[in-house]
Amino acid sequence: KRRGYTPQPLRRVHIRKRNGKLRPLGIPTMKDRAMQALYLMALAPVAETTADANSYGFRKERSTADAVQQCFNDLARTTSPQWILEGDIKGCFDHISHEWLLDNIPMDKVLLRKWLKSGFIFNKQLFPTEEGTPQGGIISPTLANMTLDGLEKLLADSFPINRSKKNYYTPMINLVRYADDFIITGESKELLENHVKPLVIEFLQARGLTLSEEKTKITHIEE
């Protein structure tokens, strides 16, 4: 039970990324971290039942090595797809739609809203949070995963394999995702550019997210 529980504003800190830019983190209080951990114990098993099969980040018994192995499995054969869409989501954690989370995450909505709207303190000033789930929150990785889950099924449903003996055809669509980084394979550059990418953009827009035009690219595996 909530029993009048109200989370405190997050403490904003910045860490430097490899490219020299700063990544903002929102650090909850110890009490808020404990409450998030408690609710995560109930939410995590639910998240596992709806997770994409080839999602590897922030999941028990999965690692970057597993994601790399799956990429190898998808691309190593002579009959494997030759083209890859490398997806980069702009500030994924910072821009997830609060409305989407409140409509789709199966947990106490009042408490989830309080966590999302708790704001953060920086330089002794309180700032509101209108979107996103803070990097630094214990429950945030699972919320981000649940936001992005469903893309693999959408791609499979949109680009089915024709298994007819006379007209066998496969678009060679495979998704491998680690947290907010992902690749999608395809039989041609045109398929990825004209059909797959617009579908991904639409999927992300519904969740308040966008692809980075600068960092998202389509490449041949030999490049």
Question: Each predicted region: which residue ranges?
Answer:
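Active-site beta-loop-alpha junctions of metal-dependent nucleic acid enzymes
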Residues: 60-64
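Detector for glycine-centered tight turns/loop "hinges" at secondary-structure junctions
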Residues: 19-20, 124
